[in-house]
């Protein structure tokens, strides 16, 4: 569960290393974001010569959370970190590679480009 001021690692090669959630999109007073939700975030750590810079405000989709995900078949899935992929204005990923596994819920949220770039979908 991601809320305001939560820091997430970035799971792509856009140049950002860490982002901080500012707002969760999809509702007027939405408190938490889960896997597949789009958030507005600020870049807190970035590498030099990257596509995004420190302090830039970006949109991102959550791909991994420490909080477990309950599936309809009764299974639970949880990850070791909170991670997101930075998006452009067309809701396509800015980076060309995805690092680490992504959750299957990203596919249900219609982010097929992220699913196709991911090395593993859990």
Swiss-Prot record:
GO terms for cellular component: cytosolic large ribosomal subunit. Keywords: Ribonucleoprotein, Ribosomal protein, RNA-binding, rRNA-binding. GO terms for molecular function: large ribosomal subunit rRNA binding; structural constituent of ribosome. Pfam families: Ribosomal_L14. It comes from the Bacteria. GO terms for biological process: translation. CDD domains: Ribosomal_uL14. NCBIfam families: rplN_bact (TIGR01067). Belongs to the universal ribosomal protein uL14 family. Binds to 23S rRNA. Forms part of two intersubunit bridges in the 70S ribosome. Part of the 50S ribosomal subunit. Forms a cluster with proteins L3 and L19. In the 70S ribosome, L14 and L19 interact and together make contacts with the 16S rRNA in bridges B5 and B8. This is Large ribosomal subunit protein uL14.
